[in-house]
Amino acid sequence: MIETNKKASWSELCPDVLRCVFELLSFSDLNRTRSVCSSWHSASRHCVPTQNQIPWLILFPRNNVNNNNNNSCVLFVPDDRDSLYKTKDLGVGFMLSNCLATYGSWILMMDRLCNLNILNPLTGEKIDLPRTKFDLPRLESSVACLWIDEKTKDYIVVWKIKNSLVYAKKGNHTWQQVFSMNEELSVEQIVYEHKTQKLYVHFNDSTLSIWRLSREDPHGVFENYIPFDFVFQDFLPDRRTDEELYVKEYIDTRLNIALTTSGELLKVASVVQKSKRWLFRIYKMNYIKRRWERIESLGDEALILDMGITIVAKDIPGLKRNSIYISGFDYGRKHLDHIFIFDLTTQESEPLPYCVSSSNDFSDARWFFPSFSQSPY
């Protein structure tokens, strides 16, 4: 046997071995391997990252004279806090559109004529939805929700348009009506749960309507959720001493709904103050006492407030358990001070890193969950 003193070099590892390892890495870790050396860069080229379990933040381009025809989105990946990524050019029509909702890798967009489409910003794949038959004014925003199967591209979009709630599924050529409402009632939020095919509709009077979309004709489902409301005093540690200061600082309140991983319904009350501070209270229904009761913790879950869902967050790098991921509603979509992760344990907000906060030229922001069926490189 001939012995050799030559040391093995990690840059000379077999490409097949490298690919076996790379396929186990997250998007961020896989991206880091590409900068190690040319052989690792080559081996990683056709690798697909492992299934993504953390929300990414997508920042949409602003439509103004200083935009320099930038029709791409900026992506922030929480487990890679020092870097930003950019999508491909998504076209002028994209820059002139507004995002209404996200699901998985997909975003629901509304163009200037109030027509909707579903877009994958990572691949550029686009699904046009039925044209609207209504004479609509130019809408800057609207209430909608999205569900889509990443493989089959089956989808459901539910949209509040004028005084009606309508939906479209894959194969539909027109929008179908769920229900109509009087002008005094306004839809604040829509959450769809595909396992049960239930649609949760939250109104501005804090009431809730539940519908099942499993048939051709949607039908209402009775569930005994009593109306819920809150007053600003609920947020005061000491009502006698704190009320005056609170009123001076107060900007607005918001009430959201969310579904946990086990299917429980939560109500999330929030307050934003002039100091850019946010306060949160989370409640769930006590059916025995017939009242909403505050819960102090989400446990090993995290709440994505944009989407109205919680996700499992235990032992997942880059994902904070017992936290709320928020993109600021109407306040934060153009102000990075209101896009953050709120830690329910410490009651403190974790701001975005400098690489994101220095990206001022954006019009909107959303959390979403991209996945990869092919190499992103």
UniProtKB/Swiss-Prot annotation:
InterPro entries: F-box-like_dom_sf, F-box_BR-signaling, F-box_dom, KIB1-4_b-propeller. Pfam families: Beta-prop_KIB1-4 (PF03478), F-box (PF00646). This is F-box protein At2g05970. Residues 8-55 form the F-box domain. It comes from Arabidopsis thaliana (Mouse-ear cress). Gene3D superfamilies: 1.20.1280.50. Transmembrane segments: none annotated. PANTHER family: F-BOX DOMAIN-CONTAINING PROTEIN, OS07G0183000 PROTEIN-RELATED.
